[in-house]
Amino acid sequence: MSEAAASQTKIVTACIVVIGNEILSGRTSDANIAYLAGELGKLGVRVMECRVIPDVEATIVATINEVRARFDYVFTTGGIGPTHDDITADSIARAFGVGISEHPEAVARMSRHYGDPALFTPARRRMARVPHGATLVDNPISVAPGFQMENVFTFAGIPMIVESMFQSMKHRLVGGDPVLSRTVRTNLPEGVIAEPLGALQKRFEDLDIGSYPGFRAGKVSVSLVLRGTDDARLVAATNELIDTIHKMKGEAEELAQ
């Protein structure tokens, strides 16, 4: 890729912030990062950083203020439920220096959902509170909405709800050039392929080339993943990689994308 072509590549970045003591304690495994990163990649948004932080207001405030200034988009998961330790909405309001109160539309949606006023308890009403100036993010599954404050999108923590919230708002995102990928699987160990792989990376500096070892049928198997925005460059690098592996008497299989 020429310098002129590289300069025309539009890169849009994102950070994912997972909020929850239950993740840090090991009690719950996060499933949202992989989903969001995959979906964002399809839209041409590159996840450049992920953080896992506790339900501590000062930490949430500091983290949000840092990452919203560094990335085009920020996505948070967790901490907008009905219990006392669900403090994400209040913390984001503080990060933006605004107040927080019940959103009329959120209250209306939840009132319709629960039907019986006795079921719409004070605890559940907490989930209708959003920072002043926020735009609601629809929740097709359990109604209680997420919200958007400028470039920060706040979702619940339950994976099924995260997925539904993301699908409901992804049209708001403006992505860059889609990130494409190709994968070559080889039987050569990383220690053998490392030097030529490094040389290939130097020749194709516009691509990201990674090596991921594992076992397949009880034998060493290494997946070599090439990622970039220029398909022609990806094809050239992939073909060169396969040729190099064959010259080293190794097996090379390009996997279907």
Task: Give the location of each predicted region.
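N-terminal small/polar loop signature for handling phosphorylated ligands or for N-terminal nucleophile
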Residues: 34-87, 93-94
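Basic/polar N-terminal segments that are highly enriched at the extreme N-terminus
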Residues: 1-9, 257
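An accessory alpha-helical subdomain
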Residues: 151-244
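Proline/glycine-rich low-complexity loops and linkers
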Residues: 62-65, 86-176
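Glycine-rich beta-strand-to-loop/alpha-helix junction loops that act as flexible
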Residues: 19-21, 76-84, 157, 227-229
